[in-house]
Design a protein with these regions (language model features):
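Short glycine/acidic-rich loop motifs that flank beta-strands on beta-rich extracellular proteins
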Residues: 110, 159-164, 181-188, 214-223, ...
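N-terminal, post-signal-peptide segments of secreted/periplasmic proteins
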Residues: 23-161, 166-171, 324-477, 483-488, ...
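Edge beta-strands of extracellular beta-sandwich domains
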Residues: 491-503
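Bacterial N-terminal signal peptides that target proteins for export
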Residues: 1-9
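The right-handed parallel beta-helix/beta-solenoid scaffold, focusing on the short coil/turn
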Residues: 33, 63, 75, 88-90, ...
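Right-handed parallel beta-helix
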Residues: 107-249
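Bacterial N-terminal signal peptides
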Residues: 8-17
Length: 503
């Protein structure tokens, strides 16, 4: 037996070197050659940014472009005409940022001229500005490439700050993106050049730790952009912004992750237009007309703080009602009269406001009030109508599969035995999740903090009931009122229930 084991052991030892070779780490890469930008004059001579990009494009993967701080701050390069498109792999680094936090600015004002958003024409004649199809006058262009890294730059005063078109595996981090007044601060799009989506061309890009200030749209994920990460950024608009549209717009973009960002003072903090399975988590939305405006299917809004907006989450109708999930969000202090409606927002007379509102009109609806984009046909007869009840014809149905809010009926018991009872309606013989929230005020109608969740089922008639243990925990004890949502097995979350006062 010992001899047999020794033979086996020797055989394993013989093949281990081969296995190790098969799984060894990637060999070290050759060091990159540095192209140093130490002149801010826009010409083709050595030392200029234009020269550096042109040189790097001739041998992708060989170079790192380092832009030095020349003279005294602020450090500004003003191209006189569009720069060459960037071919990766390549790094473009503003060197002063890592040293003292100063950005090197690339400023488009020398050739992007005109009044306001009229300086940025769209792809269709007569249209201009944000929220019309455009790839006009971008600052830095990543098209049909990969492996580009941008860091330590301030990119400002273009129509699009950075255009990422049919490009993947790029990283844009630790930059300032300022006052790009047409398409977006950063636009990630699979646009095929004719307005159609391409499904696998704009993937696995990372947009992290940037500051987006006073862009029309801060960032766009459109026309097939998928599996991209947008994390730890600030998206902010101020009164200086002529067209404060969206912090982020997702249009026909799927499976993107948007996490730990801040969205401040836009028409919509984030707007999803027929995008699917996007994951929106741990963000903060404040001061927006609508915090999140949503269509599409399978999107998850999870663990966000949504406070001080007109509407917290606005769920828009679409031709076929589809499920979207809202879970573990803190939603409070909304319902403000913020009428900022540049291709989004809530300005319709009598518009309901609050934490979660179904049936909010968007640009696609006849009842929308606001700008659909400069030069866009506003004829309401060409727009969709919203159904006000189930079973109506010639209108778009209630969103989120029409899932109705639960009803909270009573709190029973004392101390550790205290429990919340409620009921809801849904699909017969189906599984549901009920999520319960606490509010400080006795008439609090939002979701100030999460108390927990409980599973429930419907019977053959679609009637469901639930019991949620409140116990003696501090969160439950501090609540002056309770609210709840119910989410179906398909992932369709209801609006919040009417509050149940505890005092």
């Amino acid at each position: 037996m010992s001899r047999c084991l020794s033979v086996v052991a020797l055989s394993l030892l013989a093949v281990l070197p081969t296995l190790a070779l098969a799984y060894q780490a990637e060999p070290p890469r050759a060091p990159l050659q540095v192209l140093r930008v130490d002149r801010y004059t826009d010409d083709a001579n050595a030392g200029s940014l234009r020269w550096a990009i042109t040189t790097a494009n001739a041998a992708p993967g060989r170079y790192r472009i380092e832009i030095d701080a020349v003279g005294v701050a602020p450090y500004v390069i003003r191209p006189a005409s569009p720069l060459p498109e960037i071919k990766g792999p390549v790094q473009i680094i503003g060197t002063s940022w890592a040293r003292d936090g100063q950005y090197i600015a690339i400023d488009g004002s020398a050739y992007v001229t005109g009044t306001g958003t009229d300086a940025c024409p769209g792809a269709e004649p007569g249209q201009s500005g944000t929220n019309v199809r455009t790839t006009t006058l971008p600052g830095l262009v990543l098209r049909d490439t990969q492996g580009v890294e941008l860091v330590g730059l301030e990119i400002r005063n273009f129509c699009i700050g950075v255009l990422v078109n049919r490009s993947s595996h790029n990283e844009i981090h630790d930059n300032r993106i300022v006052a790009n007044k047409g398409g977006a601060g950063i636009m990630l799009t699979g646009d095929d050049g004719k307005g159609q989506s391409t499904a696998t061309t704009t993937m696995h890009n990372r947009i992290v730790r940037n500051e987006f200030l006073d862009n029309g749209d801060g960032l766009e994920l459109t026309r097939g952009a998928a599996w991209n990460l947008v994390a730890d950024n600030l998206f902010q608009s101020t009164p200086a912004n002529p067209e404060p549209s969206q912090g982020i717009e997702i249009l026909w973009g799927n499976d993107n992750s948007v996490v730990r960002n801040r969205f401040v003072d836009y028409s919509d903090g984030l707007q999803i237009n027929w995008g699917n399975r996007n994951y929106i988590a741990a963000n903060t939305f404040t001061g927006n007309s609508i915090g999140l405006s949503i269509t599409g299917s399978g999107n998850v809004v999870d663990g966000n703080t949504i406070t001080g907006n007109g509407i917290g989450i606005g769920v828009r109708p679409q031709p076929v009602s589809a499920p979207n999930r809202f879970t573990a969000n803190r939603i409070y202090g909304n319902g403000l009269l913020i009428e900022r409606c540049e291709a989004g927002g809530a300005c319709m007379k009598g518009q309901p406001r609050g934490a979660i509102v179904f049936g909010v009109p968007g640009l696609e609806h006849a009842s929308f009030v606001g700008s659909r984009g400069r030069g866009v046909d506003n004829d309401p007869s060409k727009r969709a109508h919203i159904c006000t009840a189930a079973g109506q014809a010639d209108c778009q149905p209630l969103p989120n599969l029409g899932q109705a809010a639960p009803q909270l009926t009573a709190v029973q018991g004392k101390g550790a035995q205290r429990q919340l009872n409620g009921r809801f309606k849904g699909v017969p013989d189906s599984h549901y999740q009920v999520e319960v929230f606490g509010n400080r005020a006795t008439n609090g109608r939002e979701a100030e903090w999460v108390l927990g969740s409980v599973e429930a089922r419907t019977d053959a008639q679609g009637q469901g009931s639930f019991t949620f243990p409140l116990g003696t925990g501090a969160d439950a004890a501090a609540a002056g009122s309770l609210t709840a949502t119910v989410t179906s097995a398909q992932g369709a979350t209801s609006p919040l229930s009417a509050p149940l006062s505890l005092r």
